[in-house]
Swiss-Prot record:
This is Zinc finger CCCH domain-containing protein 13. GO terms for molecular function: DNA binding; mRNA binding; zinc ion binding. Keywords: DNA-binding, Metal-binding, Repeat, Zinc, Zinc-finger. Transmembrane segments: none annotated. SUPFAM superfamilies: CCCH zinc finger. It comes from the Eukaryota. PROSITE patterns: ZF_C3H1. The keyword Zinc-finger applies. A zinc finger (C3H1-type) spans 9-37, 55-82.
């Protein structure tokens, strides 16, 4: 199994999603820094086909429910049904 590689971009802001989850759905396309040897501070969650978090039991994201997009992206605390 090959290890997933995320871009290291010293001098750029760190990818907040990567720091929390240890994953980044943008992979090599992400413009932020992904430091090696990080320990995620939250458990990973499942993402829907748009890369938004599925959080069963949480309130549905009001922006996503209304417009089909989410301003907070993968860091949103609300559920994004499929």
């Amino acid at each position: 199994m090959s290890e997933e590689k995320f871009p290291e971009r010293p001098g750029e802001p760190e990818c907040s999603y990567y720091l929390r989850t240890g994953n980044c759905y943008l992979k090599q396309n992400c413009k932020y820094h992904h430091p090696k040897n990080i320990t995620p501070s939250e458990p990973q969650c499942t993402l829907n086909d748009k890369g938004l978090p599925l959080r069963p039991g949480q309130a549905i994201c009001p922006h996503y429910s209304r417009f089909g997009i989410c301003r907070s992206g993968p860091t949103c605390k609300f559920d994004h049904f499929t």
